[in-house]
Amino acid sequence: MSALRPLLLLLLPLCPGPGPGPGSEAKVTRSCAETRQVLGARGYSLNLIPPALISGEHLRVCPQEYTCCSSETEQRLIRETEATFRGLVEDSGSFLVHTLAARHRKFDEFFLEMLSVAQHSLTQLFSHSYGRLYAQHALIFNGLFSRLRDFYGESGEGLDDTLADFWAQLLERVFPLLHPQYSFPPDYLLCLSRLASSTDGSLQPFGDSPRRLRLQITRTLVAARAFVQGLETGRNVVSEALKVPVSEGCSQALMRLIGCPLCRGVPSLMPCQGFCLNVVRGCLSSRGLEPDWGNYLDGLLILADKLQGPFSFELTAESIGVKISEGLMYLQENSAKVSAQVFQECGPPDPVPARNRRAPPPREEAGRLWSMVTEEERPTTAAGTNLHRLVWELRERLARMRGFWARLSLTVCGDSRMAADASLEAAPCWTGAGRGRYLPPVVGGSPAEQVNNPELKVDASGPDVPTRRRRLQLRAATARMKTAALGHDLDGQDADEDASGSGGGQQYADDWMAGAVAPPARPPRPPYPPRRDGSGGKGGGGSARYNQGRSRSGGASIGFHTQTILILSLSALALLGPR
């Protein structure tokens, strides 16, 4: 044995030693040339970066082994890694913000322009049919469209009041024109309005047109307003949600992920994909918007389908003039019956002296120029678009948004600055401590799974307060859109009192037909208070605007709104309350 010892000593240097372990790149590569090159290009002073590895006992985040970073360099890299992460998150979601903002602008412009087109069409129709008579009373019609725009823009009163006042003013102007031989002082017109607004519906001077016009306009404008508000809410919520605050634990994990390879002198060694996913999911764990985001997108699509279907904004806007014209034709054709009722209730009017008497205006057929828009002739705006095209474009873009928050960590880690390509899983990568393979388990993004995140401590109580508030905003917008799709206004006005609450507009197709059978009348409501001051005249003293087809939310709708508000209140408590 003693004779073999010299031979063993000669062979020992030829035997291979142990393979490189974690941190061995510091022993193999003692130069900081690559780090100096990368950081120098970023504007770092080379005086702060040593040419070779030094002791890392001064480091606070990176492993305290051999390093190329001073304390100042490490702190600067921490700030840069935070900025890189924030920028990637915002860039990943920028298409959401831009898409929702662009769709909001396009739909808003379209709805407003369709109202302008409807006003222009009515002006042309009535100018040709009534000529000078329309010109004398054009302010009534212009006022109607102005108040419709105010309601759509959230600055006007309810549509019931708007339409009731319009029909009242129209009756007060038109009825004297049918009887130029009589004088109708203000007191008599007040009696006329009171009679027309009586709850028994005995006098319907414009037939069923006011009810059908109110039903169409209210359901359509409520839906359009909720839809545009929903797009605006989504844009604001996403814009705020993408501004991710970085906690101290997240900041340190990001530094270990993409900053520490520079300090170890191996900037070309990319972080492992699993390492990146754990860090990013931990940083985003309390700030996702699912599942409320998916429900919000569903609400947009449901309401968009209604707006190009049973609640068609195009057909509603284009039919305003038709419904008003039908009402005027009904009054002319039934003037004898209507006048007899008025004269019986309000008394015979005083005759006009013969020298002041005007000739009656010619009766012309008001609707002769009108032709309904066919499927092949969808009205377009000045921009050459129509609602069908806008909804198709919206549907295509919303499909790309679905699941965005669930995929956000994969999107961020797919950037070359954050992690190695997932296809290179078998190749060595940066594990947080050195070169090798990432062995800890990759956890999911839910709060329950993030409790076991190996890279940073995550609050298991769920979303933070700002995120809960944003999710509640999405829930409120979704509830408003889905309620509008059922023909109701969540803000308090019942937009669909003549249709079933569960049908959401199944009766609406009948309302397009002139002369459609009206649904059964509801129980009479108490008369409305006077809308303007005035002393009593013939037929009674109180004043009341004509209110044909006008109604407030009844008991059924009150229960509907109470239930919806209760659901939102419970959602708020669930989101904002303690976990």
UniProtKB/Swiss-Prot annotation:
Compartment annotation: Cell membrane
Highest rank taxon of the organism: Eukaryota
Main location: membrane
Keywords: Cell membrane, Glycoprotein, GPI-anchor, Heparan sulfate, Lipoprotein, Membrane, Proteoglycan, Secreted, Signal
Biased composition (Pro residues): 520-529
Similarity comment text for this entry: Belongs to the glypican family.
Protein name: Glypican-2
